[in-house]
């Protein structure tokens, strides 16, 4: 028999986002009540995501569009973790970054310089559009000595799948 967990005794919670809080643009069942309970009980909480593409502000707005009020300080992304790692391990370093606003803003905010000629690191994050030119540039920079860092080690990202029938219905 398993042991039951008394959540009231817990001081705080760390939750993944995609697939736990929402899927696509839909809040999952029970999430609104859970967040309300966290606030009512003054519980500490942090939402983690390994998606480096979003800033905490964008995540705040995404959840707001779904009807949830979660302040920006309750989000921590892989972009923020990557930027903190570089700031601590290689102060003053420069990077060639491939990714969205979440990654670029986190790197800038950490005082990391962008460099597309001879960077110390090539940092690859979540992106909606990678070009062959950008990937070739990144590959060449790594071959010339830049260290490669992935802001997310997933081999694939979560996505909504549509069958051909569902696609026909949306047309």
Please describe what each predicted stretch is.
Residues 3-5, 111-120:
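Short acidic low-complexity segments
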Residues 23-46, 54-58, 72-89, 101, ...:
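Short, acidic loop-to-helix structural element flanking the phosphoryl-transfer center
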Residues 63-80, 164:
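Structural recognition of alpha->loop->beta junctions
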Residues 88-110:
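Short, charged N-terminal beta->alpha structural module
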Residues 118-130:
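Short, well-ordered secondary-structure micro-motifs within conserved domains or adaptor modules
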Residues 162-171:
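Single conserved hydrophobic/aromatic residue that forms the stacking wall/gate
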């Amino acid at each position: 028999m398993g042991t039951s967990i008394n959540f009231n005794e817990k001081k705080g919670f760390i939750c993944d986002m995609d697939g736990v809080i929402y899927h696509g643009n839909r809040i999952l069942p029970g999430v609104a009540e859970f967040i309300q309970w966290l606030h009512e009980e003054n519980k500490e909480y942090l939402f983690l995501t390994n998606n480096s593409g979003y800033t905490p502000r964008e995540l705040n707005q995404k959840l707001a569009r779904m009807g949830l009020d979660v302040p920006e300080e309750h989000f921590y992304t892989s972009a923020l973790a990557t930027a903190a790692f570089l700031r601590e391990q290689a102060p003053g370093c420069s990077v060639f970054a491939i990714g969205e606003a979440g990654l670029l803003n986190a790197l800038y905010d950490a005082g990391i310089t962008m460099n597309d000629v001879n960077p110390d690191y090539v940092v690859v994050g979540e992106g909606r559009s990678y070009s062959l030119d950008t990937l070739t540039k990144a590959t060449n920079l790594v071959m010339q000595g830049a260290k490669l860092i992935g802001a997310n080690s997933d081999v694939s990202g979560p996505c909504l799948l549509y069958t051909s029938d569902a696609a026909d219905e949306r047309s």
